[in-house]
Amino acid sequence: MSEILKNDVDPIETQDWLQSLDSLIREEGVERAQYIVEQVIGQARTSGVSLPTGVTTDYVNTIPVAEQPAYPGDHAIERRIRSAVRWNAIAMVLRSQKKDLDLGGHISTFQSAATMYEVCYNHFFKAATEKNGGDLIFFQGHAAPGMYARAFLEGRLTEEQMDNFRQEAFTDGLSSYPHPKLMPEFWQFSTVSMGLGPVNAIYQARFLKYLDNRGLKDTKDQKVYAFLGDGEMDEIESKGALTFAAREHLDNLIFTISCNLQRLDGPVNGNGKIVQELEGLFTGAGWEVIKVLWGSDWDKLFAKDTSGKLTQLMMEVVDGDYLTFKSKDGAYIREHFFGRYPETAALVADMTDDEIWALRRGAHDSEKLYAAYAKAQNATKPVVILAHQVKGYKIPEAESKNTAHQSKKMSYESLKGFRDFFELPLTDEQVEKLEYIKFAEGTPEYEYLHGHRKALNGYVPARRTKFDVEYKVPALEEFKALLEEQPRGISTTMAFTRALNILLKDKNIGKTIVPMIADEARTFGMEGLFRQVGIYNPHGQNYIPSDRDLVAYYREAKDGQVLQEGINELGATASWLAAANSYSVNNQPMIPFFIYYSMFGFQRVGDMMWAAGDQLARGFMVGGTSGRTTLNGEGLQHEDGHSHIQAGIIPNCITYDPSFAFEVAVIMQDGINRMYGEKQEDVFYYMTTLNEVMDQPAMPAGAEEGIRKGLYKFETVEGKKGKGHVQLLGSGAIMRHVREAAQILANDYGVTSDVFSAPSFNELAREGHDAARWNLLHPTETQRVPYVAQVLADLPTVASTDYVKGYADQIRAFVPSKHYHVLGTDGFGRSDSRANLREHFEVDARYVVVAALSQLAKEGTVSNQVVADAIAKFGLNVDRINPLYA
């Protein structure tokens, strides 16, 4: 750009244009001015004028003073309530610290956000009613002490509970952060670790729209609020779904980002401006951005700033300096902020240093915040409020310091100073004892506190533990077609699809089934659902799909049932979690079935799945194309041999690796019954399915209980008497090789084999350890026998799966025989035929036979030479590298 264009060559003409715009705004309003400016910009582009993108605005409040609505609250009473909440939050954390239990705790985050939350508690947060689920609030995890402090003032928590903050093992304590598992009637959503709150809030807002558009629940009056930290926005999960929210027109979604400019160790962007960065990000993603940066004290300064230097200065100052200013004093701010320009220095010439120090950031001003939230209520797109605040507000040891996040203590003098600033009704002795503040019934504060919550339907947060609407669980007989022998081979994935179709057609619960796919429907043979129930899209289908002439064409509809999530496992899991919590959040039980490549589930979104356990989710995760050797051509990053290990660490995740179609049916019916039947258990299911076609026999009589528990005898293959007897366990893809091995053992070696299907080694291990624990603690009582020991005999045993050896090895302690050998697929996957891969990982029928003979040799039934001869006969390379290291 030339030097001429960098400077204003005709200031008078420029001033004329600006005055014309001011006149237009004054006479015809902001909307008309916006329209005219857009037309001018359009004409400029048409005429070849190069324009900046313009995704950020000046570092000032978005809402002009003239457009601020009147504040509906009583400032004096609200300040007294807010101050009491502030104190109780600090007192709770400090009282727990006195016990010397190394409990930790955070006092700075809530102090910076207290005004923000209190404005919402008094004027916006709606609780649930019988007809309406209320607003859904994702509270910032580190601000949890403030929510406890308010609930204590409301009489919903006791002093004993407050004193047991972060002490939950043996007392009625309060969890460190929002954890529904630990406080099931209080917290609705898990928001830690950081980043989970934003993405889950987006998909929760989307699921409300889904319910409404499908006519299942009227959610139009509900909002989803998410309170986040500016440091938290560095998490990929925080940013990854922003464009999705705009695409879905989630006008029911409100983010509030606490822009205290600090993360855990220091500034978020000390050399820049995180507010501007976030504004550009959200504006570009299609959100409405409302900046609340400066309190009402600044309004008179802006009004006096005819030169525009104050706004210029605010744009020039970087975040590192803003943090330093609030860690110093008024004199420092006068010199190092206002003193940068004569014009800005003149603005505060008649102000004392104390008055300068008292100038507030926007997030500490109720009127500015109320204006922002009021504007957000009527938005036509998702909204983000960027609220400028001071971390550790009014805590001398923490205020705006890099150590603020780690501040867990306050001196007696600091506590007295805090009391004095907030005018708390506490004596010096009460301050020293950290006594809690409560309002007596009948006081103005008590009546105001409860009156405003009653006007908003009740108290938040609060969580429903069970749904109370009628829900009829289908009987196993409804899956009869899958319990019988199949006329031709099918994969267990196809069996799942058929079972899903049975559920979709169920007249009682069909509408509550939520099929979810991460852009792989055709891989799983599920494209028929596109036409059958449609793909959900809030905008319908405004184009003619290229495959419209096909039976299974890509049909999108506003009331579509399938949630097609695209290539987006994290978002799809967040979507699943929203549906899996609908029973609690909406009193509307929904059964989500999310099917995906099993390698891209728990491994990719493990933190989200742990949160699903915490949130007491109910639903099905289906790991398709599972097993290390089954998705044979895709190679190392696609072949799953360990998802059951990862799923098994989540206590309320029930996992299965079925071998047969009838097992799939039993597992699905059992899961629905446990989660949505009379008991309403807080569990969710993980089931792996195969893309390998196999023969599908009929279910053996009486096998249901064994399938559910994880082990049952499938068949016995008779050999010759006296030649040996083994037990062969298998699951999933390797079950066919186990059955083949049983035939070889009988035909070639005369060995009898009891073949067991083991749909869940995880469930077997849990039950076994539970029995072992009981036995340990009850030495004088009749000892319990683990289920594995009840089912298996004291015979040489071999377990074979398409997963790492650790999966089947979990039950070793409960197997009656000391001769127990496990085959598995430890090591990196690779591409080849299934036969070659199973040879590579040493899990095919030949290795099962050799392992069985080896165990027989150990008990003396056959000689070691028999084993050696079998190895030679099968051509096994005994000198090749262990596949674990290959």
Curated annotation (Swiss-Prot):
Keyword terms: Oxidoreductase, Pyruvate, Thiamine pyrophosphate
GO terms of molecular function: pyruvate dehydrogenase (acetyl-transferring) activity
Catalyses which reaction(s): N(6)-[(R)-lipoyl]-L-lysyl-[protein] + pyruvate + H(+) = N(6)-[(R)-S(8)-acetyldihydrolipoyl]-L-lysyl-[protein] + CO2
Disulfide topology: none
Keyword ATP-binding appears in the UniProt entry: no
InterPro entries (UniProt xref): PDC_E1_N (IPR035807), PDH/Transketolase (IPR051157), PDH_E1 (IPR004660), PDH_E1_M (IPR041621), THDP-binding (IPR029061), Transketo_C/PFOR_II (IPR009014), Transketolase-like_C_2 (IPR055152), Transketolase_N (IPR005474)
PANTHER family: PYRUVATE DEHYDROGENASE E1 COMPONENT
Protein purpose: Component of the pyruvate dehydrogenase (PDH) complex, that catalyzes the overall conversion of pyruvate to acetyl-CoA and CO(2).
Protein name: Pyruvate dehydrogenase E1 component
Gene designation per UniProt: aceE
